[in-house]
Amino acid sequence: MIDRYKHQQLRIGSVSPQQIRAWANKILPNGEIIGEVTKPYTFHYKTNKPEKDGLFCERIFGPIKSGICACGNYRIIGDEKEDPQFCEQCGVEFVDSRIRRYQMGYIKLGCPVTHVWYLKRLPSYIANLLDKPLKELEGLVYCDFSFARPIAKKPTFLRLRGSFEYEIQSWKYSIPLFFTTQGFDKFRNREISTGAVAIREQLADLDLRIILDNSLLEWKELGEEGPAGNDWEDRKIGRRRDFLVRRMELAKHFLRTNIEPEWMVLCLLPVLPPELRPIIQIDGGKLMSSDINELYRRVIYRNNTLIDLLTTSRSTPGELVMCQEKLVQEAVDTLLDNGIRGQPMRDGHNKIYKSFSDVIEGKEGRFRETLLGKRVDYSGRSVIVVGPSLSLHQCGLPREIAIELFQTFVICGLIRQHLASNIGVAKSKIREKGPIIWEILQEVMQGHPVLLNRAPTLHRLGVQAFQPILVEGRAICLHPLVCKGFNADFDGDQMAVHVPLSLEAQAEARLLMFSHMNLLSPTIGDPISIPTQDMLIGLYVLTSGNRRGICANRYNTWNRRNYPDERIDDNSYTYTKEPLFCNSYDAIGAYRQKRINLDSPLWLRWRLDQRLIASREAPIEVHYESLGTSHEIYGHYLIVRSVKKEILSIYIRTTVGHISLYREIEEAIQGFCRACSYGT
């Protein structure tokens, strides 16, 4: 449906019988109103054409071929705003055959039936509104009560019976005689309340505002009573208060949505459009039909039998009528939700029929698979892998996916730069995948963000925007810090990529949806982009240095503490200059040349730090050179002094891993400071 703001939306709820009839009814030029399905047939076995007034009737649901009626006549399809044109002979409207995807019909039921979703689903809406046990209502609906108390507010024969205390035995023999009389229908409608009619009358008599007031008053009274001192009584009161809350919420919902409670009892049963329950011919001439067609046929057969019993046979026993009403109720229940009342209905091959609920619910249902999960233009899907070289706001897009998603923009770029004269030439150049194509694609992607989504999208961080970067391979590369928001890992997860087309969508992606704009959890405010799994292991390997090497001697207290049983031979140990590096670039260059390892300890020249100079820490070892200079070795640093005890230089003990981590943090801080300065 489309609201007044021209927003397309889908709303599920109860509708009135008038609305159901309005969905299906069409008025022919001769004044005949069509829309009711009265026959359980589908196609004629000889002509292979839809049966009139059947489940695939062309008069009700529209022509099978566009502009061709059941007689075979053809007429040009006019504009939708023009008056509809019908065939004078068969009554089929000359419209597009796609109307059979949304044109509905209806079945006029011989007796009201309750909607099984509102009766049997927990919590039961009908039981909550009527404040009656579900077992009692089920017995009433399925005619298990051969005798039910009257619900009419006027005096009845049964109310009169209750005022007498004598002749009780005679009533047992006299009342059943009424079930076999010709006037049983009138007697039953006035005196006996059974079936879905009883539920409908009670729901129609409800005043939702009075229910709200009374439920609120009772809820307050139960809260003021206080504990009863008995656990069983306290739990009973608690359950009653919870029930009253649910009842008030349900009444508010009916008032807010302008839905009448009696609409939960069906008098007209909608019939789905034929294209949503098709019959397909397979190899060998065999036909495959949707299970819903068979369930509809079952309803129509039983409903027609009930109508015949009520109209043609006036002397039909009342028990037979109630039994047939129960069969109609069960047939509608099976159509809506097969198996909700226990044993599901099966076909001749012992296969369970798929009801309407089975068609729409679940991962493979109509909503999740066809409406919500359907493929859309300008979208792709692939496996995600880690991209360690990416920034937080970037994602790696495979060339094969990128050239398809941005093909329209690349074509415009080729024509704009006069590299192609038309769209056909541009597409042929794209198929050749020359170097100029990738250059134009790079330019297009620089100014166009993409959206990444991982199902299920449970919160807003399930869809985030990224700046695409071309990568080799066929997998989408993702920064590991954003995985927590998507609840993703790199064990085969797949993600969908979408291209925002409109300027509004691109602005929303840049201002609100970029990954570096969503660093905190929207629910509790905790950081959402935190290192996990591989990143923690990598940080540990990067910063866990081999502490033995520089100070592996008897004077190092750290070695005595960690290796008490290992003896260092003083005769074989002589001091040699450990790797000394003037800057971090030399240290990283030595690592790349494989002169040192990632965790090899080294001395890195450091700026003169007053905290180190003023430290009162005693050196672990002091080495003297022949020229008089000395090397004072401390736990984490080394000081080189001249003959006059002046500090010449300071070296800190570190590893290549620590240096790499420090440089990454320093570059990140400098980039953040530059961004802040540009912003101001």
Curated annotation (Swiss-Prot):
MF GO annotations: DNA binding; DNA-directed RNA polymerase activity; magnesium ion binding; zinc ion binding
GO biological process entries: DNA-templated transcription
Residues binding Mg(2+): 489, 491, 493
Pfam families: RNA_pol_Rpb1_1 (PF04997), RNA_pol_Rpb1_2 (PF00623)
Keyword terms: Chloroplast, DNA-directed RNA polymerase, Magnesium, Metal-binding, Nucleotidyltransferase, Plastid, Transcription, Transferase, Zinc
Cellular localisation: Plastid, Chloroplast
Manner of cofactor binding, per the entry note: Binds 1 Mg(2+) ion per subunit.
Binding residues for Zn(2+): 69, 71, 87, 90
EC number, as in UniProt: 2.7.7.6
Tagged with keyword Transcription: yes
PANTHER family: DNA-DIRECTED RNA POLYMERASE, DNA-DIRECTED RNA POLYMERASE SUBUNIT BETA
Similarity comment: Belongs to the RNA polymerase beta' chain family. RpoC1 subfamily.
Subunit relationships: In plastids the minimal PEP RNA polymerase catalytic core is composed of four subunits: alpha, beta, beta', and beta''. When a (nuclear-encoded) sigma factor is associated with the core the holoenzyme is formed, which can initiate transcription.
Protein name per UniProt: DNA-directed RNA polymerase subunit beta'
